[in-house]
Structure formats: structure tokens, C-alpha cells
């Protein structure tokens, strides 16, 4: 996959998405342009990723709590990939690509208020795409726009308030303790690399400076 010319213009990073049963159920893939302003074909990118993460891959399925008034976020049945497109141009390209329902596209909360982004989010959701809201918007989203998001993403330093309409996922878990804390806080999945314990503090004595 990395030899594909399309990916030669991108920097890739990945982490595991883990559920409450401690099973790896999906992958979180971060894509960043190798150079600012690089033009990436979102449709071609999604097609390429679809070949790497096919329908037969492991799947995450969540049942969302309905919104007041009868609305509700779409389910994530069959989700295999959480896609974090770093950079405004790349995100726009991905949002405007044909929907791949098993891929969940992350959208930063501070961008959702932009009319072009909101329109792309609505169109992708209407086409069957899955979306995650990353962070907390400054103001409450309109119900129709909020319902486009199946999941809301947080990190330990800025945990989201409980009781929101979307299922919560925590990013950046780096240890089993981080993982347990995420689930204790009410998150349904966590993304990161929490395998193995963090290094133990050094017990070596500090060198004593010679007397003058």
C-alpha cells in the first residue's frame, strides 16, 4: 500500500481502537499531507483504503442513544476504520468523496460551524457515511447536524460531559491504566496503543557531587 503514488504525498500514523471487551475492533488512521497545500484526490484515497480495509475486516458496531424529539445518530455497524484527516484541504477532500459506510470520518468540532463543512457533513451522512465529532463545539449544534455524528471523540485532558447524544470515544490512551480510566468515564471505545505497562521509575541513586 505504501508504494502507491497517492500515499507518497501523505504521512501515515495508526492506532488500535479497543472496545470494552478489550478487543481490537477497528483501526484509527491519521493522514497528513507531506507538504502543506498538497492536493489529494479524496475519492481515489477512499477507494485505495477500501482495498486495504475490505468489508470482511473486523467490525465495530455501536447502538446509539436517540436524540430528544425522535432523532438519532446513525449506527456504526461494520465500522473498520476511523479516519483522521489532518489539514483543512485534505479533510474537505475526504468529506466530499463518495461515502464508505464502514469508514468513520473525524471532523474537528471547531470546523463544524463553517457552512461548507456543515453542508459536506450533512451530505456525507445522507449518503450513508459515518462521522465522528472531535472535541466539543463552542455552541450546541442544530439537531439535524448533531444527528449526523455517530460518535464524539475526547482526550483525557478535555473529557466530554456525560449524557450527550453520541457515544464517546477517548483518544491517546497509552497504558492499561489509561484504557481503564476511559471506560470508567463512560467511553465505549478507546484509541491508542495501551499495550504493556509504562516504564517503571528509575530506582538508581543520583550521583553525589564531590565536596569542595
Task: Explain the meaning of each model-derived region.
Residues 67, 146, 204-205:
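Charge-rich, low-complexity amphipathic helices
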Residues 89, 94-196:
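The catalytic core of metal-dependent phosphodiesterases that act on cyclic dinucleotides
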Residues 74, 134, 162, 205-206:
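Context-gated lysine
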Residues 3-4, 11, 122, 164, ...:
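Generic, low-specificity signal for short hydrophobic/alpha-helical stretches with a mild N-terminal bias
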Residues 199-212:
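C-terminal helical cap(s) of enzyme catalytic domains, especially alpha/beta-barrels
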Residues 1-99, 111-112, 212:
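Bacterial c-di-GMP phosphodiesterase EAL domain
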Residues 32-35, 144, 202:
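Residue-level signature of transmembrane alpha-helix interfaces in integral membrane proteins
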Amino acid at each position: 500500500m505504501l508504494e502507491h503514488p497517492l500515499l507518497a504525498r501523505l504521512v501515515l500514523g495508526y492506532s488500535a481502537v479497543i472496545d470494552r471487551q478489550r478487543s481490537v475492533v477497528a483501526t484509527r488512521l491519521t493522514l497528513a499531507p507531506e507538504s502543506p497545500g498538497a492536493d489529494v484526490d479524496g475519492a481515489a484515497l477512499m477507494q485505495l483504503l477500501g482495498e486495504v480495509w475490505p468489508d470482511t475486516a473486523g467490525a465495530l458496531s455501536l447502538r446509539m442513544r436517540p436524540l430528544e424529539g425522535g432523532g438519532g445518530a446513525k449506527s456504526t455497524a461494520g465500522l473498520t476504520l476511523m479516519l483522521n484527516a489532518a489539514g483543512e484541504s485534505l479533510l474537505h477532500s475526504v468529506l466530499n468523496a463518495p461515502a464508505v459506510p464502514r469508514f468513520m470520518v473525524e471532523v474537528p468540532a471547531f470546523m463544524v460551524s463553517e457552512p461548507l463543512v456543515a453542508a459536506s457533513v450533512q451530505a456525507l451522512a445522507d449518503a450513508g457515511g459515518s462521522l465522528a465529532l472531535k472535541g466539543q463545539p463552542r455552541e450546541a449544534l442544530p439537531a439535524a447536524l448533531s444527528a449526523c455524528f455517530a460518535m464524539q471523540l475526547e482526550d483525557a485532558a478535555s473529557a466530554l460531559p456525560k449524557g450527550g447524544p453520541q457515544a464517546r470515544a477517548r483518544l491517546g490512551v497509552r497504558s492499561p491504566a489509561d484504557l481503564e480510566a476511559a471506560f470508567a468515564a463512560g467511553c465505549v471505545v478507546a484509541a491508542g496503543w495501551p499495550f504493556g505497562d509504562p516504564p517503571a521509575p528509575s530506582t538508581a541513586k543520583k550521583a553525589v557531587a564531590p565536596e569542595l
